[in-house]
Amino acid sequence: KFPLKIINEKPYIDVLVKSGKSETLAKVLVDNGNSDALWLFANRTNIIEIPSKNIPDFLGRGFSGNIYGKKGRIEYMKLGKYEFKNIITSFPDSVSTQNINNTIDRWGSIGGEVLRRFYQIFDYKNNALYLKPNKNFEQEFLYDKSGLELQHEGMEWVEERIEVRGHYKGEVFDGTGEKITNSFAYKFDLKPIYKIFNVRTSSSAEAAGLKVNDQLISINGKIAYKMSLDQITKLLRGPEDKIIKLEVLRDGKAIPIRFRLRTML
């Protein structure tokens, strides 16, 4: 059970963090909609330091535009009796934090990558948050090792060929009773379009020549529109040196791209 503070109709809790010389208590927004583990606003205090080993990164989109900053691993974050070591933490830059909720003593956000490890009950009436570890609790904190940020760019009609099967052992017959071999039909379905909207500087994706607005056709032999964005994201968070083979559409041409996932943190 954790004390929950409601400020401007938003929930906050206190966590202990160490990113620098000292451990400090930080008030953070509880944000299940944020896919990262932890955000800290280093520019609002001199106690929190950005780790020396970090990468510049696109952190997300807010109401006022894109949010950029850095990612690094801090020594730990403590949530009551639960401790997360070497947790991947995002540090929005000062320009981005100007447009983020300016609660005076807010130091960041705790996001979905931590919260998904718990069963959660929000008791707003009694200002309490109940957390209980679930099956995800011991999972490693992962991050994108490709340098790609993908987004859903709407839908498109796709023609697919399907085999027409008869009722007996796959046999198909025409109107005269003659057997038809290799019978196919075609159907049109609306499928998702995935495009690249950011390529991290000095990443494997940048080195391989991938560009903003490239449309993803396939990844490791799987047609992109048959996958969810979450499934693709998980592939790009795979182990060091995993080979990624993409086919992208650029200016009407299909381009094959191959690179390896690279650990940068």
Explain the meaning of each model-derived region.
Residues 1-5, 84-154:
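Glycine-rich flap/beta-hairpin and adjacent strands of clan AA aspartyl proteases
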Residues 1-25, 54-73, 100-103, 233:
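Pepsin-like aspartyl protease folds
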Residues 12-60, 111, 198, 202:
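Aspartyl protease active-site motif detector
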Residues 77, 111, 148, 205, ...:
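Terminal peptide-recognition signature
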Residues 99-100, 143, 147-149, 159, ...:
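C-terminal, low-ordered peptide segments at domain boundaries
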Residues 223-231, 256:
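Short, Lys/Arg- and Gly-enriched loop/turn segments at beta-strand edges
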